[in-house]
Structure formats: structure tokens, C-alpha cells
């Protein structure tokens, strides 16, 4: 029952992460909001600011009073945000719901992951991976549903359905019984600054900064970019759905790949794949090649974030909680800044130039992953030298 509740909550978070990227690919929504590309980037910035704020607050609150209040309040915030978007007719009308979606989505993400982590201490890895699949299903549903109803129904009813689902989640969580609060120490910025000085922590942090930014840019701007090539809104949303499907399929394959490939090698290879996919997306306008580009990107992105976190967990076991908190904070700053930068560049130079941002992010991942790999090789060589003396 508790895992089912967590799966429902993370499913709603997947919807939150996919909804703006889907909506901005629809001519109907862009015309109703009367926003330019720079303002579109600003809406994404507000979404991720809300996610960052709630992520930092939710952890200590969960530690003090448990998951229930965060899950109920977060679901209610998402419901309000979806309803607000359904009736938005201006930039301000979209900006306020975006903040609400971010606040609610960040709370759902944090609380559901903490809940599953506490419930399944002996099977934490597999169960968190299973939870992530429900996130992918939620994210995939939105562009698929938008593609199905395109030209048949207005977008507002779809958003109101999402609002109703989030509201139902709030009622579900209100009726459920949750474990008592564990009351350990919450995230501390002072402690975070101390662990930031550990060798390699900031390299991993900047790698996740690039990865989070890339994921936010591709999920948020792909439908707009595809629409700018002259393809229909329905095609654009289906191509976006292809990205989410590839990401989910890749996540399912990662655990198997890690049995034959090292974690650091997988991150480097994933960065290279993301670079190739972004280049395909940037240099082609045909529908077939755009599909190839997003599929390569989705499959390549799948292994970066969870594997980098696994590297951090293996390397900094004694301070894993604080290290993870710092890494998530750095990553969310990337999630805020990259899609915003795409909007600013797109407004001045065009969407094609804006999509250089995830290409540069993929290059950054390759450089940082190579550095991690080389650093580990140097440490191993030093150990062998010490052993030979």
C-alpha cells in the first residue's frame, strides 16, 4: 500500500516534469499565453526554482514530522498549479502555476524517494529503480495524451484531468498511515561546504549540473524545436514522447549494463552518446533524423544521473547523505539555468542556436567523466606503486 502511494506520487511528479515542455509545443497554448521564447525560458526557470526550494525544505520537514504532510501539501500544490495553467492567458498567469508545480513536484519527488528508501532498506536500489519507472510512465503519458487529443479537444480539459489526479492523490495520502518521523539531522549548508572540499565531489556536482540542465532543456524545448522545423504540433509531441520512452527504456537497461561495464566508463560512454544525439538533433530537419536524435539522447541520458549518484555513494559512504544533498542542489541549479538559457538564446538567434546549450552540456559531461576516469586510474596506479615498494 505504501509503495503504491509512493508510485502514484512519483507518477504525478513525472507529469509535472513533462507538462510545460508538451504545452509549449502546442500552437494553441503559445497563442493563449502570448509569450515569446525568452518568457518561455523564464517559466522553466520558475518551475525549477520551486523544485529547488521545496527540495531543500522537504527533507528537514520529513525528518521532523514525517512524510504525510509533505505528500498531502505537495499534491494539493500540483493540483492548484495544473488548474491555474488550464485557465492561464498571460505570462503571469502561467508563471504563478509554474512555481506551484515546482513547489509541489519537488516535495513529491523528495518525499516518495525518502519513503521508499526507508521502507526497503535491504532492497533500496532495486525499489528506487522501480519507483523511477513510474516517474517515466507519468512523464510519457502527457505528450502521448496531447498527441492523441490534438485537433479534437482543447488542452484545458487535459490539464484539469491532471489537476483532478493530483487532488485525488492528496486525498489518498490523507487517508494513508505512514511510518513515524525518523528525526535525524537535516541537510546542513555548513556540512555541505565541508564535504565540497572532498576530492572529486565538485567534479561530480558539475557533471550532474550539466546532466540536469540537459534533461530539463530536452524535455522542455524539444517540442518547440521540432515545431520550428515546420512539423505539426502532433508530430512534435510524439517525438517528445519518444524521448521519454527512450529514457525509461534506458533506465531499465542500465542495471544490466553495469554488470559488464564499469560505472565511470558507462557515464563517459553515455556522455558521448548524448553528444552524438544532440549533434543529430541540431544538424537535421527531417522527421526521421529528429526521431533518431531524441532516441539516442534519451537512451544516453538514462545512465548518467543514477550512475553518477552510485559513484558518489560508493566513494563517500560515511557522508553519503550530505554529499547527495549537495549534489542534488548543484544539479537543480543546472536544471534551472539551462532551459532558461535556451529561451534567451532562442529569442535572439532562433531555437536552433538555443539547442546548442544541451550540446555544450553533453560535451561538458564527456570532459568531466573523462577527468573522473583519469583520476581513478591515477589513484589505482599510485596504489600499485605503493604496493610494489
Annotate the PLM regions:
Residues 97-133:
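Cytoplasmic helix-loop-helix junction between adjacent transmembrane helices
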Residues 81, 92-100, 288-296:
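Paired small-residue
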Residues 20-21, 199-241, 245-249:
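Extracytoplasmic gate region of multi-pass secondary transporters
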